[in-house]
């Protein structure tokens, strides 16, 4: 069925349903209920009490597991006389490893791209023939 046919039938049926039945034109009464009058307060029942006092187990505190050790931090004091020596050591180490024996070539990159595109085309044609 077409969408327009379904939409037209739906509109006609909703109009027919809206016309039937008597309407109440009287004034509605409003009832106001405050939160303090209900049975729930802050997510708990107001009228119930705990049967026994909870015991402190020592493993949980404030809803979290309390056996996790605190992180240990240490403070290291650095003298001004140590900084130039360490800076020179870093520069010297960097200059020793400046050369590398690796070479790169991009001469055959176009061939590899063409082969992969050709393979993808063959796979696409094969899939089309199967379907």
From Swiss-Prot:
Keywords attached to this entry: Cell wall, Glycoprotein, GPI-anchor, Lipoprotein, Membrane, Secreted, Signal, Stress response
Membrane topology term: Lipid-anchor; GPI-anchor
GO cellular component, one term: side of membrane
Residues modified by glycosylation: 97, 101
Signal peptide residues on this chain, from the entry's feature table: 1-18
Propeptide: 106-131
Residues with lipid group (GPI-anchor amidated serine): 105
Cellular localization per UniProt: Secreted, Cell wall; Membrane
Biased composition (Low complexity): 97-110
Family label: Belongs to the PGA14 family.
Role description: Hydrophilin which is essential to overcome the simple stress of the desiccation-rehydration process.
Protein name: Hydrophilin PGA14
Organism: Candida albicans (strain SC5314 / ATCC MYA-2876) (Yeast)
Record gene name: PGA14
